[in-house]
């Protein structure tokens, strides 16, 4: 895609979200709608954002038994999302069924490790090894399950890209140089992630919380 930036629209009010997208749409490539937005506004909200004319990424992080996840994927066919997320830790069968149930033009990507987590967090959940090792294991599982790609931090995307040449890689938790990292622990700049093989760059607060969101989006676009 010509512009890999997807705006993370984590705004509870629909009209405010639409207004923000209208302001910045010339400088982004799509809009990511997460659980907060989807649970608040449902199918109607997705349709309203889609009217802005940009691809919609539904970041629903589906994680359940295979049959339930497949049914959930079928229920969002009508929304025609460009991308949908499932948790790679849900296992191969779940990912296979999710991909089989997805629309023909929808990319299904597996969430590997949230960018708010680090090695200590992994240890507390009983996962051995480094974040890098954990992401690489789940990336291999997602590839073998037939997914289009994965979600990973910018710190891992370079290594995953070398392992999975044809993969589609979504990188969240990005911060322009000089920005505060907030609750993100494994961050890089949008330019670095793109250079390392990211297909989609998910950027939220550096644009949505900026004094001038349009200028912030324009500045990020100029670095790519």
Swiss-Prot record:
Substrate binds at residues 10, 32, 59-68, 115, 175, 184, 204-205. InterPro entries: Aldolase_TIM (IPR013785), OMPdecase (IPR014732), OMPdecase_AS (IPR018089), OMPdecase_bac (IPR047596), OMPdeCOase_dom (IPR001754), RibuloseP-bd_barrel (IPR011060). SMART domains: OMPdecase (SM00934). It catalyses: orotidine 5'-phosphate + H(+) = UMP + CO2. Homodimer. GO terms for molecular function: orotidine-5'-phosphate decarboxylase activity. GO terms for cellular component: cytosol. Catalyzes the decarboxylation of orotidine 5'-monophosphate (OMP) to uridine 5'-monophosphate (UMP). Keywords: Decarboxylase, Lyase, Pyrimidine biosynthesis. Gene3D superfamilies: Aldolase class I. Pathway: Pyrimidine metabolism; UMP biosynthesis via de novo pathway; UMP from orotate: step 2/2. This is Orotidine 5'-phosphate decarboxylase. PANTHER family: OROTIDINE 5'-PHOSPHATE DECARBOXYLASE. HAMAP family: OMPdecase_type1_B (MF_01200_B). One of its GO terms (biological process) is 'de novo' pyrimidine nucleobase biosynthetic process. The active site is at 61 (proton donor). It comes from Erythrobacter litoralis (strain HTCC2594). The keyword Lyase applies. Its EC number is 4.1.1.23. Belongs to the OMP decarboxylase family. Type 1 subfamily. Disulfide bonds: none annotated.
């Amino acid at each position: 895609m010509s512009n890999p930036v997807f705006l993370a629209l984590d705004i509870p009010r629909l009209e405010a979200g639409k207004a923000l997208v209208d302001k910045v749409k010339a400088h982004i490539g799509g809009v990511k709608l997460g659980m907060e937005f989807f649970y608040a506004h449902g199918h109607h909200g997705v349709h309203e954002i889609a009217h802005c004319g940009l691809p919609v990424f539904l970041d629903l992080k589906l994680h359940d038994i295979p049959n339930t996840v497949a049914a959930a994927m079928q229920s969002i066919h009508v929304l025609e999302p460009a991308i949908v997320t499932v948790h790679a830790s849900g296992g191969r069968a779940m990912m296979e069924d999710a991909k089989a149930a997805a629309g023909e033009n929808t990319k299904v990507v597996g969430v590997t490790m949230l960018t708010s987590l680090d090695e200590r967090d992994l240890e507390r959940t009983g996962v051995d090894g480094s974040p890098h090792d954990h992401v690489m294991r789940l990336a291999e599982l997602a590839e073998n399950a037939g997914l289009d790609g994965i979600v990973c931090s910018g710190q891992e995307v370079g290594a995953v890209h070398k392992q999975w040449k044809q993969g589609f890689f979504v990188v969240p938790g990005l911060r322009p140089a000089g920005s505060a990292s907030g609750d993100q622990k494994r961050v890089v700049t949008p330019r670095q992630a793109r250079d390392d093989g990211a297909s989609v760059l998910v950027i939220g607060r550096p644009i949505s919380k900026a004094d001038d969101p349009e200028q912030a989006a324009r500045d990020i676009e100029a670095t790519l």
